[in-house]
Amino acid sequence: MTRTSPRHHAPSETKRRVPMGGVHTNPGKKLTITAVAFQFFINGLVLAAWATSIPHVKNAYSFNDAELGVLLLIMAAGALLFMSLAGYFSHVFGSRRMSIQSALLFPSALVLIFAAPNCMTFLCSIVLFGAANGAMDVLMNHQAKALEENGFPRIMAFLHGCSSTGILAGIMTFGVIGDGHYVARSVTLLTGILIVARWLFPHLLDDVRSGEHRLAIGELRNCKLLMFGILSFLTMVTDGAIAEWSKLYLIRVEQVTDQVGSLGYVAFTLLMIAGRISGDRVKDAIGCRALIAISGSLASAGMTTALFMPSFAGKLAGFALLGLGMANLVPIIFSEAASMNTVSKTVGLTFVSVCGYSGFLVGPPIIGRIAEAVGLGRALLFIIAVGVIVACASVFFDRHRSGQPEP
């Protein structure tokens, strides 16, 4: 449930929080929602463009696997650091300004990565890329939560669906359609983003602030916040593991080509998009607790199907079902963490963002280590366990529907 405190209903407070041309006029409503959705789309698009270009970067600089691992660790460190600082920057400089800067810096850093004339410039670009990604991840969720607080209770899952759509677009732009010309493609990507952003980003919500912006150690003793963090971590472990290992699993088991092996992740992503687009309405209809329980069960059933169905079509159906099950977990966790009465919105979002991003990073190597010992198929049983844990954890979520207070 999205809890809205009484102050958000006060006319004077609403006017202060929502800029002119914001969500109180019909054209402004559409433009504000579109602007925030475009942020999520950019995030998925640029992240996928980078991920599919990693082999090119490795070959261009002759990195070995260990050096590439260090490189990704440096990028992750920058992301985690600026995730932690994003709330502070938003508090000091304003949400709209920082959201715009991070959203434009992210694709700009991608151009610098491909155009870097030497290794030192490349390393600086990687740090900048990670920092922009981390800050943008937190800030765009601030904007999403602000929309929920200003009359759009069914929006978080849809916005995360826009991110998944961006991921598909990034895979198509940089992974499927040819090879080479990375600088030209990244510049074209940045130019398109700048053109659309010039029109949309002035309509982002401004002054999205929430009092305390520092994560105090004492707040980590909050059991519900810790639970949200653990669930965010496990959910993103699964996302990272499927992104990395689903293709290899199908290639090994079904003896298919690289292109055909990619269909597993495509099926996963397509059903995730479908689930997120409809997720807010489903949550409104059946309640948060029921949706979490169903999602965890679908995820476990999907991974079980993908592992044990003998046919290739059956395995694809399993990955699709897994994507449907995973679709609404992150949006709900983020929304609930930002709605807690015992910690500020900024602290809740920052904590679950850091936990989730950490899970996405460590998920593939965790599965890889387990696979070395017991085989990839058995290692992926871990994802079935994640679904069971999520379904059991549904009892800690409110059972009420959106807009209905918990009795």
From Swiss-Prot:
It is found in: Cell membrane. One of its GO terms (molecular function) is transmembrane transporter activity. Pfam families: MFS_1 (PF07690). It comes from Rhizobium meliloti (Ensifer meliloti). Changing residue 184 to G: In strain: RM220-3. Residues 1-24 are annotated as: Disordered. It is a multi-pass membrane protein. Changing residue 164 to R: In strain: RM220-3. May be a membrane transport protein that could either transport a precursor for rhizopine biosynthesis into bacteroids or the finished product from the bacteroids. Its main location: membrane. This is Membrane protein MosC. The keyword Manganese does not apply. The chain crosses the membrane at residues 31-51, 69-89, 109-129, 157-177, 186-206, 225-245, 255-275, 290-310, 316-336, 347-367, 377-397. GO terms for cellular component: plasma membrane. Keywords: Cell membrane, Membrane, Transmembrane, Transmembrane helix, Transport.
